[in-house]
Amino acid sequence: ASDFLMQQGKVNRVLVICPLSIMDSAWRNDLFDFAPHRTVAVAHGEAKKRKSIIEQNTDYVVINYDGVEIVSESIKNGGFDLVIVDEATHYKNAQTRRWKTLNKILRDNTWLWMMTGTPAAQSPVDAYGLAKMVNPTAVPRFGGTFRDMVMTKITNFKWIPKADATNTVHRVLQPAIRFTKDECLDLPSMTYVKRAVELTRQQKKYYEQLKRKLVLEVTGEQVTAVNAAVGMNKLLQISSGAVYTDDGATLEFDIKHRYKVLREVIDESSQKVLVFVPFKHAINILTDRLRKDGISTEIIQGSVSAPARTSIFKQFQEATSPRVLVIQPASAAHGVTLTAANTVVWWSPVSSLETYAQANARVHRSGQKHKCTVVQLQGSDAEKHVYRLLDNRINIHTKITDLYKEILD
């Protein structure tokens, strides 16, 4: 569409803002495939280098969210008349510096396309920042007023969506075009399955000890969303194989039962496998075990540089090795195509419905030729409760205190 507008003389230059992890692997590669006659540059690195790239006058410049803040003045003067924001939910909060920086860059005659599959994944309030940027007249001046339009206050700490919240969100996000995956792609089916995992004796011991401690802490006290999230996170960490103690140390657990089930899933899979692991230390434990067993494995997490991620993704898609990617969900939940795999395993659940859905979509997208399976490893009641909410597409953050009480009962 952007290339068409260029051909029509309506657009001269395009700025693409996207996650760091997909600047090369998705955007540069896709532009090369679909618009090989256009010039493309990726603005990444030190500020001086980014500025130099922007000044080169290529047709497309691809930059990550934080990079926009670093070279905002250069972007203002860069002659961009179309701005494309991929995974636009990163701009849902109009109070952030990130949002304000981009808003200042946009001129009245700037084309703006904000792309997301989940415009209000966590709450109807998430739509406010997107709407205020695309069509400011569609929403009130203040976010609190919009929140009152779409949410009802139940307690000091709890808000729930109003019955007509979805209609309100749809209205304020116009103009918009929506395509479902089924409308765009003829994809093989996707199946969700649960695999029961027995906690080891050591895990059970510490899990029950922590539950008793948490029950004592909340007895007679009001449970807040903050302490509920902290407590639940500790229970999930124990279930996954490593828990961070109050003094910053890490306590590791035997993961033999969970690992055995994972190996069964890997052995059963006809293609490659993605394993999503929310906790960093558990990533290291699991990866060591897989490599020790001779399974070629690479890690994708926050500490892996953008060039290294691009190289790993390319190798995963095109070569026989690695067979398994162990991924911290937030590091590769958006934009990346990983269709060399047809099996997704959740070593432990995440609390974000958006991250969960987007991560699963890494395999179920254009180019997939095989039936896909999402496997949830469930060992503790905390994990089962979280997966239940994810399966029912319920925003966990709005239910965190209720969920916490259920787990402790």
Language-model segment annotations:
Residues 16, 62-63, 84, 111-117, ...:
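Structural recognition of the conserved hydrophobic beta-strand(s) that form the central parallel beta-sheet
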Residues 351-409:
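A conserved SF2-helicase RecA2
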Residues 21, 41-50, 64-70, 92-96, ...:
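Conserved helicase motor
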Residues 11-13, 28, 37, 82, ...:
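Conserved P-loop NTPase motor "coupling/switch" region that bridges the ATPase
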Residues 1-18, 186-336, 401-409:
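Conserved Helicase C-terminal RecA-like lobe
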Residues 68-74, 121-124, 283-287, 309-313, ...:
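SF2 helicase motor core recognition
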Residues 54-58, 71-81, 105-107:
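Short basic/glycine-enriched coil/helix segment immediately N-terminal to the Walker B
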Residues 22-46, 136-137:
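Conserved helix-turn-beta segment of the N-terminal RecA-like "Helicase ATP-binding" lobe
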